[in-house]
Amino acid sequence: MGKGEPADGSDDLARLDAVGLAEAIRKGDLSPVESVQAAIDRIERLDPQLNAVIHRQFEQALATAASPDLPNGPFRGVPILIKDLWAEEAGQPHHAGMKCLRDAGFTSDTDSHMVTRYKQAGFVIVGRTNTPELGLVATTEPHAYGPTRNPWDTDHSPGGSSGGAAAAVASGMVPAANASDGGGSIRIPAAMCGLVGLKPSRGRVSMGPNREEWGVSVQHVVCHTVRDAATILDATAIPFPGDGVIAPDHGRPYDTRVGSETGRLTIGVLYDNHRVDVHPDCVAAVRRTADLLADLGHEVIDSHPKALNDVGWTEDLSGAFATNWAVGAALSVDHLGERLGRELTASDVEPGTWTMAGMGRGFSAFDYARAQSVMARWRRALAAWWADGHDLLLTPTTSLPPPRLGELTPAEGEPLRGSQRSMPYATFTSPFNTTGQPAISLPLGASEGLPVGVQLVAAYGREDVLVDVGSQLERKVDWSQHRAPIHA
C-alpha cells in the first residue's frame, strides 16, 4: 500500500492547531458547526485509508456544536477524538480494542472526569479512535477493528497504543486527540507520526472515576504544537474527588510558559541503552537536538541517571514493570468482565491478553509487593539525578523507526510476541511511567521519510520546564507545517 493516496486539494482549517482554530471561531471566521462539519468531512474522506476512527458520533457532534448550551470555554467548537480505552463517555461505546465488548454493544454509563473537562472547555467530541486490546502493545492492530495505518506510509504502524489518535491528528482529521500512556503510548505514536506527545506527571490529569492514579498510566493528548499540549493541559488538570495522587501545582498556567525565556538550563543526554541497539537515525535526532539546545544557550552535558544504563538496575526494573503490567492486565480483564456481567474466558480476548492476564493472576501478593518496592527504589534513584541540579534529560523517544504492520503482533504459538517485540520501542519511555515523571516527545528526526522523535524528561511535577524548552525548540524548528503524505 505504501505512501497511500493523498487527498485532493488542501484544507486550510486542517493546518490550524486547536488553539488557532478556537481563535478563528472566537473571531467569527467560522462557527462551531462549520468547524465540526469540516472535521467530519475530513474523517469521511481520509479514514478509509487509515482506519483511525472506529466509532463516529457525527449527529451528536453537530447537535452539540449547534446548541446554545455549548460551553464558552477556551476550545469552544473545536472537534476532538477520544481514544477508545478508559476515556469514557456516557451512552457511547467503550470497547478497549476487545471483540467481546464490541459484539455485546457495550456502552459506558458515565463520563470520565477528563471527558467532562473536555466538554467544559468547549471541545466537541466527534468520535472514538482505534487502540490495541487493552493497550498492551506498541502498535494498533486489534482483532476487533483491524490495523490502523501510518499516514506517513500506510505499510507502517502509527505506533500504540494511541495509534488511532496519532494517525487521525497526523492526517489532519482533528487538531488534537485524546491519548493515554502506560509505557509510552502517548510518546511512541507521537514519535512515529511526527507529533507532539506530552505525558503528564502521575496525578496531573485525573483518571477518575473508573481508573486509579497509583498505576503507571496517565492521559492527555497528541497534537501538532507545544501550545496545544500546554493549553489543553490547563483545561484538564483539575483533580477529581477521591484522587489518590495529585501532582504539585507550580501556580502559573502552562500556556503562559509557551515562548518563555528560562535562562541557561542544564540538560543531560542519553544516546543509547545497553538493552537494545538504537537505530542510527534515532541517535542522529538526539545529536541534532542537543546541538539546537546548545545554540539556545543551554548547557548540554554527557550525563544521565546511572540506573538507566546499569544492568542490575534495569533487569530488576524490567521484572517489576512486567509484574505490574501483567497484574494490570488481569485487573482490566476482570473489571471489564464485571461491567459486562459475566466472567471473561480465553475466547473473549486475544491470546496475548489472556496469557498476560494469566501471568498476572499467577503472581503472589509477595511478588506484587516486591515489584512495588523495586519500582519505588528506582523512582528515588532517578529522582536524585534531577535533585543534583539537572533540569532535563534528552533521549531518543524510541530505539527504532516505525515498524511495518504485523511486526509487533502475536504469532501462532507465540501469544506474547507482540509485547516482547514492543519492548525496544518502549526502552526510553517506560522508565518514566514507573517514576511518574513528565516527558514529552518532539518531532525532531526522520528515517527514510518516516518520523522519529526525541524525548525530554523533567523532574516530577515540572511539566512547565518541558513546555518552556519544547516551545523554544519549536520556534527554532517549525515542525507544525510538516505534513504527512496522507493529509487533508
List each language-model region with its residue ranges.
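Short glycine-enriched loops at secondary-structure junctions
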Residues: 79-87, 130-132, 201, 398-400, ...
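Amidase signature
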Residues: 1-71, 235-426, 434, 461, ...
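Short, well-ordered beta-strand elements within core beta-sheets of diverse protein domains
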Residues: 20-27, 81, 101-106, 217-224, ...
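Enzymes and membrane/adaptor proteins characterized by extended Gly/Ser/Thr/Asp/Glu-rich
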Residues: 74-114
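A short acidic, glycine-rich active-site loop
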Residues: 101-108, 153-156, 414-426
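Short glycine/serine-rich loop segments
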Residues: 108-240, 393, 433-434, 438-446, ...
